[in-house]
From Swiss-Prot:
Role description: This is one of the proteins that bind and probably mediate the attachment of the 5S RNA into the large ribosomal subunit, where it forms part of the central protuberance. In the 70S ribosome it contacts protein S13 of the 30S subunit (bridge B1b), connecting the 2 subunits; this bridge is implicated in subunit movement. Contacts the P site tRNA; the 5S rRNA and some of its associated proteins might help stabilize positioning of ribosome-bound tRNAs.
GO terms for MF: rRNA binding; structural constituent of ribosome; tRNA binding
Domain of life: Bacteria
Keywords: Ribonucleoprotein, Ribosomal protein, RNA-binding, rRNA-binding, tRNA-binding
Organism: Stenotrophomonas maltophilia (strain R551-3)
SS bond list: none
GO aspect biological process, one term: translation
Endoplasmic reticulum among keywords: no
Matching SUPFAM superfamilies: RL5-like (SSF55282)
Name by which UniProt lists this protein: Large ribosomal subunit protein uL5
């Protein structure tokens, strides 16, 4: 069972990028490797219920249970100790990755207030894209009335592209809404 975006990649994106960049082999075309979701919850150091709610939200959004991240060092100004749980993360690959990106591009990002597109400067120089979401309530899986607090998350999209231009062309071919 392939998702709609995965089928679109094979039928539309690969031929378009082969023509645009002059690739001779379809295996040269950049592809998506993984999508990593990270939610830092600093308040979890004092209240464990907050972390449980964050894990529940991320489970609904991603479709799989996230791993609880723990602090590596003690920081007195943040009032955290080494080994305390401070967030959660999950990595999506294959079908779940394509389904998540489909929901992100077509449903969630248009629900952001005053949305003008995502910044095209958020590439890391090696063909990977990072973005942040300020509210988890933009995802349709989250019930607005059941949310205890508004939390943001980081989304990292890892590709096999060698340059930022190739990665931007790949994401633009997926109809990713870039501002510039």
């Amino acid at each position: 069972m392939t998702s709609r975006l995965e089928k679109f990649y094979k039928e539309e994106v690969v031929p378009a990028l082969m023509k645009q960049f002059g690739y001779t082999n379809p295996m040269e075309v950049p592809k998506l490797v993984k999508v990593t979701l990270n939610m830092g919850v600093g308040e979890a150091a004092t209240n464990k219920k907050i972390l449980e709610n964050a894990v529940g939200d991320m489970t609904k959004i991603s479709g799989q249970k996230p791993v609880v991240t723990k602090s590596r060092i003690s920081v007195a100004s943040f009032k955290i100790r080494d080994g305390w749980p401070i967030g959660c993360k999950t990595t999506l690959r294959r079908h779940k990755m394509y389904e998540f990106l489909d929901r992100l591009i077509n449903i969630s990002l248009p629900r952001v207030r005053d949305f003008r597109g995502v910044s095209g400067r958020s590439f890391d120089g090696r063909g990977n894209f990072n973005m942040g979401v300020k509210e988890q309530i933009i995802f349709p899986e989250i019930d607005f009335d059941a949310v205890d607090a508004i939390r943001g998350m980081d989304i990292a999209i890892t590709t096999t592209a060698k340059t930022d231009a190739e990665a931007k062309a790949l994401l633009a071919a997926f109809k990713f809404p870039f501002r510039n």
